[in-house]
Amino acid sequence: MPLYVMIGRDGPDGIALRKRHREAHLANLQPLVDAGRVRFAGPIRTADGDPCGSVVVFEAANLAAAQVVAETDPYAVEGVFASVEVRETLQVFPKDTT
């Protein structure tokens, strides 16, 4: 299955909105985690250590399906993210053995 990277960049109220919607964001990703389709997920941080976005590397059937994952994420829906980008990627390291 193809691999995609979702990069969400927070808007000006990102920190406050993250706190409010974090549990829904994590719950939304959990089915993908349970299915073994998430390779990596976590916040992007500023030099001061504050979250300023998120990155999720995950498997999806195609770009359209990956975009649905990004567009329906609670951080996107609730305005945490000012922008969301989804691109197909290729895992080079560590070597994918699946």
Positions of PLM-derived features:
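Conserved, structured core segments of small domains
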Residues: 1-98
